[in-house]
Design a protein with these regions (language model features):
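The canonical Cys-X-X-Cys-His
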Residues: 40-52, 102, 118, 122
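C-terminal capping alpha-helices of c-type cytochrome domains
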Residues: 80, 101-125
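Gly/Gly-Pro-rich "capping" loops immediately C-terminal to redox-active cysteine motifs
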Residues: 46-87, 104-108
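C-terminal motif of bacterial Sec signal peptides marking the signal peptidase cleavage site
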Residues: 12-15
Length: 125
């Protein structure tokens, strides 16, 4: 009887599961935000940034960003680099790209939870 209850409990907990992962990246909400062609009345991330390493749009490709970002600015974690690049894009302009093209008001357009979700997603790429 006790063994049956344990098995039933394990099955029930397994069936509950968690939030489905978006496949790439670490946040389904972040994936949705990234994929929106318009965010807060302006061009969304996907409009200017590709997720394909060999495809460059207006801004740099974000393929593998989570792996690259940690070593970009000495002493800054990948997560901090990505967050700063979103809320203060002029702080780190990628070599070969023109500064001033990315909107500088994402910190006002997106709330902290949305920025965190976007950072989670991009860090997982």
């Amino acid at each position: 009887m006790t063994r049956g209850l344990i098995v039933l409990l394990v099955l029930a907990l397994t069936a509950c599961g968690g939030e489905a992962d978006s496949g790439e990246g670490g946040s389904s909400e972040g994936a949705e935000l990234f994929s929106s062609s318009v965010l807060g009345g302006q061009a969304g991330c996907v409009t200017c940034h590709s997720l394909e390493s060999d495809r460059v749009l207006v801004g740099p490709s974000l393929a593998g960003l989570g792996e690259r970002a940690g070593g970009t600015v000495p002493g800054q974690s990948a997560r901090d680099y990505i967050r700063t690049s979103i809320v203060a894009p002029q702080a780190h302009v990628v070599e070969g790209f023109e500064g001033g093209r990315m909107p500088t008001n994402w910190g006002e357009v997106l709330d902290d939870g949305e920025i965190d979700a976007l950072v989670d997603y991009l860090e997982g790429l």
